[in-house]
Amino acid sequence: MTTRRDDDLDRAAIWQDFVLAAHLLEVALERQSQRDGNISHGHFKLLVLLSAAENQTLGLKALAGMLRFSPSRVSHTLNVLERQDLVTRGRVPTGRRAYEATLTSQGRLLVARVLRAQRAEIRDVLFGSLGAADAAALGRISARVVRVLDEAEV
């Protein structure tokens, strides 16, 4: 019979493994983004969101929400990316006092190059080590983690 203490120890070990896995994945993505794109992974995530958006454009408020960044952090990130000609920023055409960011052609090329390297060096290696059932479980668990953290507004 499993005791409460054993359950707590099991959960603590699982938690430590999960935190380490998340950290190592972020380290690998950061290293790869720097090497193949000369860009931080935090900045790269913003470019990826723009690349997937309609007309490769998103409002700054939407970007902040998706990335869980403060408005000032989004603004700072966009300043850096604008200087590198990876994005442009302008007013929303509807006349509101809102702003939006658009991925440039240079930004699209960078996203394609870095994603190609990520796929080969990180994603395919990770999924190659998992069977179909484990990959599906990882997908379900990842979606649940996102949902729980979103609901908790952590």
Model-derived segments and spans:
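Charged, amphipathic alpha-helical coiled-coil/dimerization segments
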Residues: 79-137
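N-terminal positioning helix adjacent to the helix-turn-helix/winged-helix DNA-binding module
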Residues: 14, 42-44, 59, 106, ...
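C-terminal regulatory/oligomerization modules of transcriptional regulators
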Residues: 1-9, 132-154
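N-terminal leader segment of winged-helix/HTH proteins
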Residues: 1-37, 86, 136
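Short, hydrophobic-biased segments on the C-terminal half of alpha helices
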Residues: 60, 78-79
